[in-house]
Amino acid sequence: MEAGERRNGDSMSHNHRAPKKPRLAGLLTESDIDSEFAHHQTGVARINNGSFGCCPGSVLEAQREWQLRYLRQPDEFYFNGLRRGLLASRTVISDLINADDVDEVSLVDNATTAAAIVLQKVGRCFSEGKYKKEDTVVMFHCAFQSVKKSIQAYVSRVGGSTVEVRLPFPVNSNEEIISKFREGLEKGRANGRTVRLAIIDHITSMPCVLMPVRELVKICREEGVEQVFVDAAHAIGSVKVDVKEIGADYYVSNLHKWFFCPPSIAFFYCKKRGSESDVHHPVVSHEFGNGLPIESAWIGTRDYSSQLVVPSVMEFVNRFEGGMEGIMMKNHDEAVRMGLMLADAWGTNLGSPPEMCVGMVMIGLPSKLCVGSDEDAIKLRSYLRVHYSVEVPVFYLGLRDGEEGVKDKDSGLITAYVRISHQVYNKTEDYERLRDAITELVKDQMTCQNLPAL
């Protein structure tokens, strides 16, 4: 068997192009959208799309077809269908993100996998003596916890050090973030050290803020940072992604959050610069050493169907007015509108101005709820789920000495925020249910200290 015949996802072994789009049906009506998401649990205000995303019924049907195709004849699927299907998905994504070459795009399970790929490479450079002990990785303090754990597992234990930049929150401007980031880079270079990697969120998770990613990457280039990894778990489907404009070495975004794919799938962009062979998938298969796109395309027998439905997702989004751009714009505008409604009802604030929001918005909770810890935030979130059928994350804002914070209409310090999401299936009533639940808790003088145990 020729090597090229067995390399799943290898664009060099097939002159494959994404299939032409079939003639689509008309624009989706509100009833059509309800039908697409009829599998969602009824009676729940599901305003947390940011955590786990959603997948329409038509895409789930397409996924089931891929699964059955494998089960009918696994060998034929492995040697033909899988290879071609993965390349079709990668080609769609490559075009969407304006990559120079489809071979800059790999499909992995999630952003956590991509972070492991990057940080394992950095760790190897420390272990092999290419980097000096105490050279640094710079990131924001609110980086996703799995990224921090990967640094601990792969970098810190072999001599690398970490500088965490505190993200201002609530935040009022990009300039506040840029100023803090410059301070972090300066700290990372102290005592003759070299900043080997900067990790930048495109959209932070908790708290949620749209970051000035292009400006931050540009600063990294000006300041001599060796490599830049953008963790954009929430980006594709939320904001325009142009990897050439952004200019990072590595960029990852989940497609199961805001891009309607079933879990789990993310694209991982690795800029071509001659050293791609140093980057490997954490799961080693017989494709090791054949390039990351090929390594990622076969990590052993498993269900690859979520990575094969990207063309079907495009068919779905193109049935909305304006396509993906129209969806992103509406989600942003509705999330901001609902956020302002909640802030007005509770006498609080937004965590960032509308231009620094996406389809997710942070809204301050009334101080009378007395959220005083992460445990209180979890308790309140669980209470809202069980007693009000509202699914929304609660973020505890731990102020440090010297930080003044923001006060609500009762002159109390705002110590917690909810993060609402808006996706095409959401309705105004979902947010009104949250509004009324919080208002009722405050009226009944309920605090996190006297909420009954669940």
From Swiss-Prot:
SUPFAM superfamilies: PLP-dependent transferases. Keywords: Lyase, Pyridoxal phosphate, Stress response. Its cofactor is pyridoxal 5'-phosphate. Signal peptide: none annotated. It holds the Pfam family Aminotran_5. The modification N6-(pyridoxal phosphate)lysine is found at K257. One of its GO terms (molecular function) is L-cysteine desulfhydrase activity. Disruption phenotype: No visible phenotype under normal growth conditions, but mutant plants have enlarged stomatal aperture and increased sensitivity to drought stress. It is an enzyme of class 4 (lyase). It comes from the Eukaryota. Belongs to the class-V pyridoxal-phosphate-dependent aminotransferase family. Catalyzes the production of hydrogen sulfide (H2S) from cysteine. Is mainly responsible for the degradation of cysteine to generate H2S, a regulator of stomatal movement and closure. This is L-cysteine desulfhydrase. It comes from Arabidopsis thaliana. The gene is LCD.
